[in-house]
Amino acid sequence: MANIKASKKDALTSEKRRKKNSSRRSMIRTFVKKVRVAIMSGNKTTAEDAFKKMQPIIDSHVNKGLIHKNKAARYKSNLSLQIKKISKI
């Protein structure tokens, strides 16, 4: 543990941020998983609804710096392609 008062405060705020960020990352994973489950079930409308709910959340987390913009783009691109493939099957 830190000895200097400012260092102690930094350690506490760092811990608070870590907990909040891990919760937010978990939320992102949950939303992506919901879309993947909907895709696997073959229900296009459910998959599209889940995708529409996921997109703004991922975008807001990119703006906050929680995930990299390329990772968010990759998530959205891959999942949208998989949703489009549902109708072709």
Curated annotation (Swiss-Prot):
Residues 16-26 have a biased composition (Basic residues). Pfam families: Ribosomal_S20p (PF01649). One of its GO terms (cellular component) is small ribosomal subunit. GO terms for biological process: translation. The keyword rRNA-binding applies. Keywords: Ribonucleoprotein, Ribosomal protein, RNA-binding, rRNA-binding. The keyword Aminoacyl-tRNA synthetase does not apply. Binds directly to 16S ribosomal RNA. NCBIfam families: S20 (TIGR00029). Belongs to the bacterial ribosomal protein bS20 family. This is Small ribosomal subunit protein bS20. The gene is rpsT.
